[in-house]
């Protein structure tokens, strides 16, 4: 079985740092032609982006796609809201999940799959400061253990 080629264009590392990602879902995105060309060049930033559900549609706000150099009049506003493509049942499930206290939708990564731009949306719960410190401590401990194991194997 041939594995599909997926090219990751952008990741939202801040989302993984600030939130617990409970569940992820893949969604298509509505883009203009020059925006697709810009995304293929990797000129996409998810750092300050978030998703919301408005009138039964999932909208991504704050996602920055740099204007395409040769796009001139066809370029759109880099920070405009963009619609995500999901089935109605998926949107209804997301509505149910995000209505719980403390949950939100955050774009985790953007990638190209079979020539199409896809967004991985995460149903996320905010981290407290002590949760972030625990993650940093666990990461440092794992790094120290790996270092000791490497020294023992020499």
From Swiss-Prot:
<dbReference type="GO" id="GO:0005829">
    <property type="term" value="C:cytosol"/>
</dbReference>
<dbReference type="GO" id="GO:0070929">
    <property type="term" value="P:trans-translation"/>
</dbReference>
<comment type="function">
    <text>Required for rescue of stalled ribosomes mediated by trans-translation. Binds to transfer-messenger RNA (tmRNA), required for stable association of tmRNA with ribosomes. tmRNA and SmpB together mimic tRNA shape, replacing the anticodon stem-loop with SmpB. tmRNA is encoded by the ssrA gene; the 2 termini fold to resemble tRNA(Ala) and it encodes a 'tag peptide', a short internal open reading frame. During trans-translation Ala-aminoacylated tmRNA acts like a tRNA, entering the A-site of stalled ribosomes, displacing the stalled mRNA.</text>
</comment>
<keyword id="KW-0694">RNA-binding</keyword>
<comment type="similarity">
    <text>Belongs to the SmpB family.</text>
</comment>
<dbReference type="InterPro" id="IPR020081">
    <property type="entry name" value="SsrA-bd_prot_CS"/>
</dbReference>
<dbReference type="InterPro" id="IPR000037">
    <property type="entry name" value="SsrA-bd_prot"/>
</dbReference>
<protein>
    <recommendedName>
        <fullName>SsrA-binding protein</fullName>
    </recommendedName>
</protein>
<dbReference type="InterPro" id="IPR023620">
    <property type="entry name" value="SmpB"/>
</dbReference>
<keyword id="KW-0963">Cytoplasm</keyword>
<dbReference type="Pfam" id="PF01668">
    <property type="entry name" value="SmpB"/>
</dbReference>
<dbReference type="GO" id="GO:0003723">
    <property type="term" value="F:RNA binding"/>
</dbReference>
């Amino acid at each position: 079985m041939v594995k599909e080629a997926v090219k990751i264009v952008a990741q939202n590392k801040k989302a993984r740092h600030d939130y617990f990602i409970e569940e992820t879902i893949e969604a298509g995105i509505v883009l203009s032609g020059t925006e697709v060309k810009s995304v293929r060049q990797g000129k996409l930033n998810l750092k300050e982006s978030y998703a919301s559900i408005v009138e039964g549609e999932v909208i991504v706000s704050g996602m920055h796609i740099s204007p395409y150099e040769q796009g001139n009049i066809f370029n759109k506003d880099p920070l405009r809201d963009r619609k995500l493509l999901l089935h109605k049942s998926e949107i209804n499930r997301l509505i149910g999940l995000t209505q719980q206290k403390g949950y939100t939708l955050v774009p985790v990564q953007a990638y190209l799959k079979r020539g199409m731009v896809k967004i991985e949306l995460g149903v996320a719960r905010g981290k407290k400061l002590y949760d972030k410190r625990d993650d940093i401590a666990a990461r440092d401990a794992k790094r120290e253990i790996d270092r000791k194991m490497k020294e023992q194997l020499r």
